[in-house]
UniProtKB/Swiss-Prot annotation:
Keyword list, A-Z: Decarboxylase, Lyase, Pyrimidine biosynthesis
Name the UniProt record assigns to this protein: Orotidine 5'-phosphate decarboxylase
Active site annotation, chain numbering: 54 (proton donor)
Subunit-structure text: Homodimer.
Domain of life according to the entry: Archaea
Organism whose genome encodes this protein: Sulfurisphaera tokodaii (strain DSM 16993 / JCM 10545 / NBRC 100140 / 7)
Length: 213
């Protein structure tokens, strides 16, 4: 599981959550809210810190943006629809030289996203060869398609909980990690809610495994 943080929560609470969730995705709202809070996040023991900047610009602009946060993040998220030449090619090259990773968005979780563009995005993804992809948990069919097309890539899936996708469904359809944010940090007891979500996910995954067998 990946914790999605779009706003600041008490560091003591985050530290407790970090005992159960070892990857975190940082959104623009949190970056704009308190840049100093990022220093506190980095001090915790995360396996991966992902900056969700949804980069979608020319190469020079994107490189300048990620350069500002290169010491905070292990990975960055960019849109794939912007294309390769003069955009993702240079961004990918820069991140690799910095020993950082790239995730490309292939399918978003909101209703307005159009998956008819997927064949175009798939070709871009094959050329750029990123660490992995963002595919909305609300689109299980797309998760299955992307998993079939990219068997060795990591799929991370937002949209669980607040956006309607059920806990565990994305994993059952081929995702590696589900991204959960508001269901945790907007709850009255984020740590307890984290434990409940993990338990629910484990039950769902075990059910899927039994069904497959």
């Amino acid at each position: 599981m990946i914790l999605s943080l779009d706003r600041q929560i008490p560091l003591s609470t985050l530290s407790e959550i970090n005992k159960y969730i070892h990857k975190v995705k940082i959104g623009y709202p949190l970056i704009l809210e308190n840049i100093e809070y990022l220093d506190d996040i980095v001090k915790l023991h995360w396996d991966e810190i992902i900056f969700d900047l949804k980069l979608a610009d020319i190469d020079n602009t994107m490189v300048l943006i990620v350069s500002k946060f290169i010491n905070y993040a292990d990975s960055f998220i960019a849109h794939s629809f912007i294309g390769i030449e003069g955009a993702l090619d240079k961004l990918s090259e820069f991140l690799k030289n910095q020993n950082k990773s790239l995730y490309l968005v292939l399918s978003m979780s909101h209703k307005g996203w159009n998956d008819e563009f997927y064949p175009y995005l798939k070709n871009i993804a094959k050329t750029i060869d990123p660490k992995g992809f963002v595919v909305g948990a609300t689109r299980p069919n797309m998760i299955r398609i992307v998993r079939n097309d990219f068997r060795d890539k990591i799929i991370i899936s937002p949209g669980v909980g607040a956006q309607g996708a059920m806990i565990g469904d994305a994993i059952c359809n081929g995702a590696d990690y589900e991204i959960i944010g508001r269901s945790i940090y907007e709850s009255k007891d984020p740590v307890t809610e984290t434990k409940k979500i993990i338990e629910t996910q484990e039950v769902k995954i075990n059910e899927c495994k039994r069904t497959e067998n």
